[in-house]
Design a protein with these regions (language model features):
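Short loop/turn motifs that connect adjacent beta-strands in outer-membrane beta-barrel proteins
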Residues: 20-27, 77-85, 107-115, 152-161, ...
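Outer-membrane beta-barrel initiation region
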Residues: 22-81
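Membrane-embedded beta-strand positions of outer-membrane beta-barrel proteins
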Residues: 29-33, 84-86, 114-118, 150, ...
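Transmembrane beta-strands of outer-membrane beta-barrel pores
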Residues: 35-39, 76, 88-92, 118-124, ...
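Outer-membrane pore/translocation modules
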Residues: 99-207
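Detector for outer-membrane/organellar transmembrane beta-barrel domains
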Residues: 157-163, 167, 183-254
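Outer-membrane beta-barrel "beta-signal"
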Residues: 269-275, 304-317
């Protein structure tokens, strides 16, 4: 599990209270405690080896983690059609996206939901100051930035949603010696999706997204095109979602280290499951996530495989 995800977990100091205390309150939310296992062989991941001795495919490193997730909502009106919130979105978690948000939501009478959010941890994490350094220990440095999101869900009760975001990132100690690979950047993201039901219990979501990653170095800039399909099944005592996606990343210029222009094919598969009929444990559920990502690049250095498995308990109020 990368340090971006861990930083998301660290920013969730949500306390658990009894369900009765929240029955007539404007507060609502959920909190989960998760433990799990992650594995990756990405040369760019700071959870991997500090020292690499070649610029080929990376070696596998494993990690065990214990971490919280959650969200807290406060209704601004008695009708509860306006809310401020912080935490991780259940909809995002269902498709394998972990992002801490501070935001505002408004429910229109026509079924549309407006969501405006600031995401402080999507960009902020640790990266290698020079990931291409060989034969000696690589040092980490902080990546800082800001991300802003605008989402319109279920437009006019049509099942269509539109998601847009803008983000910036700065590297504290950028030590890559090639101007073409400088990583400070601006990113623009847009995603459209459609949700439909197959029957009263099951449905699917199709989504397409585009990202323009405008970095200081042309060889670090890219355009990304992603297609995603999610299947979900809902019963009174459990919920299941399965998401698969394909993403094409096309970089803008030749990489000066490898003398070719990078191109990545990224495959993701994510399964989420929740069971909430625990005897004598009202408002509690068992949750589990399993996900894998394969990055197939035309440059061996960027090829990687990662695996994430997690199980935990969730409390909803």
């Amino acid at each position: 599990m990368n340090k971006t995800v861990l930083s998301v977990f660290a920013l969730l100091p949500i306390s658990i209270a009894s369900a009765n205390a929240f029955e007539t309150s404007r507060f609502s939310g959920e909190f989960s405690l998760n433990s799990g296992f992650s594995s990756t062989n990405s040369n760019l991941s700071t959870q991997g080896s500090e020292q690499i001795n070649h610029l080929g495919k990376g070696e596998t490193s494993d990690n065990i983690f214990v971490a919280p997730l959650g969200s807290l909502y406060y209704a601004l009106t008695e009708q509860k059609n306006q809310r401020v919130y912080l935490g991780t979105s259940r909809d995002d978690l269902a498709v394998g996206t972990l992002a801490f948000e501070l935001g505002y939501q408004y429910d229109y009478q026509n079924g549309t939901k407006l969501d405006i959010a600031y995401l402080p941890t999507v960009v902020a994490d640790e990266v290698w100051a020079n990931p291409y350094l060989t034969g000696q220990k690589r040092e980490t440095t902080d990546r800082q930035g800001n991300a802003y999101r605008l989402k319109l869900s279920n437009l006019w009760n049509s099942g269509v949603s539109l998601d847009m975001a803008y983000a910036t990132a700065e590297i504290d100690n950028e030590s890559i010696g090639y101007a073409e690979l400088q990583r400070e950047r601006e990113s623009y993201f847009i995603k459209g999706q459609y949700r439909t039901m197959l029957n009263r219990n099951a449905g699917y979501i199709t989504a397409f997204s585009y990202t323009h990653h405008d970095a200081a170095g042309d060889a670090a800039s890219f355009n990304s095109y992603k297609a995603e399909l999610s299947y979900f099944y809902l019963e009174s005592n459990y919920r299941l979602s399965l998401t698969g996606s394909y993403e094409l990343k096309e970089y803008s210029a030749e990489n000066p280290i490898f003398a070719q222009t990078r191109s990545d094919d990224v495959y993701r598969l994510f399964l989420g499951y929740e069971y909430d009929s625990i005897p004598s444990w009202d408002n509690w559920s068992i949750i589990s996530f399993v996900g894998t990502t394969i990055n197939d690049s035309n440059i061996n250095f960027y090829k990687s495989d990662s695996l994430l498995m997690s199980v935990g308990v969730n409390y909803k109020f």
